[in-house]
Amino acid sequence: MTADLPYEIWMNIIEYLGNDTINLLLVSKYLFFLATFCNISKKKLYKSIIKNGYIDILKYIRELTVNGEISAKIKMDKNLSMLLATKYGKLNIIKYLVRNGTDIRICNNYPVRKASKYGYLDIVKYLIREDCDVSDYDNYALRKATKNGYFEIVKLLVDQGADVHCCDNAPIKLACKYGYSKMVKFFHKKFLDVNYDFNEDLLLKLASSGGHYKIVKYLVTKSNNIHFEDSLISVIKKGHLDILKYFISKGVILGNNKNIRNATLMACKKGHYNVVEYLIDNIISIENMKKKYSCDIEIDIFKKNLITNTCISGNLDMLKYLISKGINVAFEDNLPIKISACHDHLHLVKYLVSISNVKINYENILISASENGCIKVVKYLVDKGVNVKDNTAIYSAGINGYLQIVKFLESNGADLIKYHNEIFLECSSNGYLNVIKYIVSKYNINKSIYDKALIIASKNNQLKTVKYLVHMGADIKSIKFHDMEKIIDNDLELLKYLVSKGLKINNIYKNLISKIIMNNDLDKLKYLISLGVNMKCIRIDTFNSCIQNRNKEMLSYLISRKIKLICYCEEGTEEDSEEDTEEDSEN
């Protein structure tokens, strides 16, 4: 049997399996020796035991712990076991732990909080019988049970004293937001029973925004003084037509006002065709807008925005509907086509092209599609014969990292060599290593370009790109003193790499040291000092900033180095402060 294998063979098995050994170790009599050998953490070991419900192994560990026959690293940890047993819903293990003295109230009543969060009703009932505190941590158990829809647990917690008004009435808000109608009625009745004043308008907005029709109807019927304004706008933006119609049936007057129009535009952008159609046919009435508004410009802008937002959404039926209402789509150099192309909505592009009666600048549309990585539209335009040789589409695709489009355009005659240096440098800034490598594979890059790219990549915190450029021969010495501030301001890992490759940092601007201290970046400060950066003094305002922000570790470090404080005179020269850092920190 597996358990009888000599531990030498187990060692070979472990070496072969790597990180996937823990479950196999659980069947070995050498479990504890091998777990220590593999450097498996106590938490990882216990997690595997409890998640799989191996209570006998847990009992065995406890027995060895009591007898002092087990490594301190993996001896019985009752609290950790309780936390994990609660998380994974192992009631039998929880009962075993409690019988052996584990406190169910550990970590601010963590067990009942997590059992409520994950919906373990049997565990919650057991913990309540064992006298846990269901209200701990701002009634966390009630809030999480509500959010996750565990109504039976919610009722049980409330019966045991959990506060339905906790955290500014969070439970009923969560029930409205996530659509639990039974819970909403339950909490609402609790409020009414004690004549509790609460924000009904907010509850209606939460339910409306989520499209929870039953809850909306319930709240409206139970209130005599509810306001619909915020909820109405939210319903339109989210596209909940049934709730919108219900509001209107209750006497809500929408009107053709700016808020309604803005909400309609948002509905267009989200593709809610049914809501847009209903509003335009019944409320906004584009045909009659001129009768209500003297400002033609405002009407024209609204119509254009309807079209552009619809193009963003990609909803062809809605676009056709708007056109049927007489809205013009040929404006601002075919902006609707360009927007559709930028979002890779090929079906809209084809439709708009098919109905266009004005000249279309296909080359500009190709550039926009390439810039935004819209390969379907790019291929369509190239198939239509759009010129790729004499425009900047390949440049736009390259600097934005869209290698697939770069290759496609190049294969169809686009001139990459014309822009390859500029693309190379831009990609160094943005970390588009795939494009950089492709350019290197095709062209001989001048050493000065490599060096310039290294500076750009270093300043923009692109570690992978920096490593590649150094590997390809970029010279670390090309990084000058005036480049240092931006580079040092980036991640420490990048700085360490550059130093390991020969970057010399003997001194830096004092204001950069101050910035590092005020940002509480102690690791970076220590590293710079280890490189020999002079930090015998700092400005008083920098030190005071550490005090104000309570950066204790930074303060302790500065004091331990006996850093001198300096201040600036009115003339702008630096003077030593009469107080040293220790005196200042005491003050």
From Swiss-Prot:
ANK repeats lie at residues 77-106, 108-136, 137-166, 168-196, 199-228, 230-256, 259-288, 302-331, 333-360, 361-390, 392-418, 420-448, 449-478, 480-507, 509-537, 539-567. It comes from the Viruses. Keywords: ANK repeat, Repeat. This is Putative ankyrin repeat protein L66.
